[in-house]
Amino acid sequence: MAETWGSEIMTQALGCLQAFSSEFALEWENSDMKAAIFKLLLGWIVLSLTAIHLAWKSYGPTVNSIYYRQGMGGQNGGTPEYPARFPIWESSSTESLKRHQE
């Protein structure tokens, strides 16, 4: 039964994809303006991703070293474990926890 449902779902999905692609191809042939805008936006995305890749290739290690410093104090290098302006609330094991009682 599970195989039947799976094959029906795949058949429907492939049918929808085929209908969409044929409709897209027909629309592509009929509309030069949409095709030009699509090509322009696709080129812009490819150019942007290429620029991001090149920038990360040259500046990536610098950015990475800023956020992941090696050394004492955890992830950010010299950062203390507890900030100085906040008190550390410590409790000993002999101290009972306060509970709400009605």
UniProtKB/Swiss-Prot annotation:
Q: How does it sit in the membrane?
A: Single-pass membrane protein
Provide GO CC annotations from the record: membrane
Q: Where are the transmembrane segments?
A: 36-56
Signal sequence range: none
Localization: Membrane
Question: What is the name of the gene encoding this protein?
Answer: tcta
Protein name per UniProt:
T-cell leukemia translocation-altered gene protein homolog
Q: Which UniProt keywords apply?
A: Membrane, Transmembrane, Transmembrane helix
Establish whether keyword Metal-binding is in the entry. Answer: no
Regarding protein family, the annotation reads: Belongs to the TCTA family.
Known InterPro entries for this protein? TCTA
Q: Provide the species name.
A: Xenopus tropicalis
